[in-house]
Amino acid sequence: MTNIRKSHPLMKIINNAFIDLPAPSNISSWWNFGSLLGICLILQILTGLFLAMHYTSDTTTAFSSVTHICRDVNYGWVIRYLHANGASMFFICLFIHVGRGLYYGSYMFLETWNIGVVLLFTVMATAFMGYVLPWGQMSFWGATVITNLLSAIPYIGTDLVEWIWGGFSVDKATLTRFFAFHFILPFIITALAAVHLLFLHETGSNNPTGISSDMDKIPFHPYYTIKDILGALFMMLILLILVLFSPDLLGDPDNYTPANPLNTPPHIKPEWYFLFAYAILRSIPNKLGGVLALVASILILILMPMLHTSKQRGMMFRPLSQCLFWMLVADLITLTWIGGQPVEHPFIIIGQLASILYFLIILVLMPITSIIENNLLKW
C-alpha cells in the first residue's frame, strides 16, 4: 500500500514541497531565510487578524482603538508589538534573502527572481499602509509625504493623488481604504509566495558553489526541516527580546502623538526599513527625479540577470566581486543612517555620494569586475 502522503492529492503537493523534496546537500544557513519569511508572514497574518478585531479605521477613533488594544485587551500589547516588530523581522529576513540571491547568483532563476521582486514591492506597500493605521503624527505625515510623491507624475499626477486620497487631503477615506488594502494584501502575498515556491521547485535550489547539484541531493525532511526549525527558534528569540524588553526601539516617538494636520513634525521619516530608499529619494533636488530614483533603487533588481557578466554563477570564488558586494552592503547601511538624519550639511552630500555609489556599484562596477575576473581565470 502506498503511503497516504504520496497518494493523497493534497498531501502529495505538501510532500513534494516540504518532505521528499530533493535538496542540495551543501546549502548553508543563508538558505534558511525563505522559510523564516514564511513564518513571519504567518505570524503577521495571525497577529494582524487579532488586531483587526479591535481596531477601528476611523480618523476619530483609530488612535484610541490602538491605545485600547494596548491597555484593555488581554495581552493586546503583546499582539500589537509582535505585529510591529514582526514587520521589522520580516524586512531583516527579506533583505538578507535578497542579499543571498545577489551574492550566490540565485537571480539566474528568472521566474523565481522576478516573482520575488514583485513580492518585495507588495510587502513594502503593505508595510507602508500598515504604518498609517495607528493614526499618529508620523502615520499621517508619512502618508501625506509618500502619497504626494505621485503628484510628480506629469499630467495625471494631481488627479492620481486625489483619487488615492479619496478627497483633497489624507483623511477618513484614505485611512479606511488603507485598512482595507492592508488587510487584503497579505493574502495576495501568500498567493505570490506559493507561485514563487512553484517556480523554485521547477529548477531546484541553487547552492553556495553555483554548480549543479543534481548528482548530490538529500531529502528536505529531516535534514532541512531541523535546520529551518533552529533558524526559526533564533528568529523568535530575537523577536521576543525586542517585544518584551524594548518594543519601541525601532518605532518613532512621534507616533505616540495623535495625528494633527495643523502641526508638522520637525523630521518626517518612514520606518527604518524604508530609510535607504528615502535617502535616495531625498538626495535628488528634483521631485520627479527623486521619485524615479526611488523606484529605480528597487526595480534595479530586475536587471540583475542582464548585468551578470561572470562565467561563474555565485561569488564564492570571486574575491573582487565579494569586495564590491560588501561595499554595497556598507553603502546601504550608510543610506539607512542618512535617511534618518535631518536634511542639512554634511548629511546631504553624504546621501548624494552614497546614492551615486549604490547605482554605480550595481550598474557599472560589478559587471566590469566580473569581466576582469573572467580574464584572470585564463592566467
Swiss-Prot record:
Record annotation: effect of changing residue 184 to T: In strain: Ryukyu wild boar 6
Keyword vocabulary terms for this entry: Electron transport, Heme, Iron, Membrane, Metal-binding, Mitochondrion, Mitochondrion inner membrane, Respiratory chain, Transmembrane, Transmembrane helix, Transport, Ubiquinone
Keyword Heme: yes
GO process annotations (BP): mitochondrial electron transport, ubiquinol to cytochrome c
Transmembrane parts of this sequence: 33-53, 77-98, 113-133, 178-198, 226-246, 288-308, 320-340, 347-367
Any further remark recorded for this protein: Heme 1 (or BL or b562) is low-potential and absorbs at about 562 nm, and heme 2 (or BH or b566) is high-potential and absorbs at about 566 nm.
Protein's recorded name: Cytochrome b
UniProt lineage: Eukaryota, Metazoa, Chordata, Craniata, Vertebrata
Gene behind the chain: MT-CYB
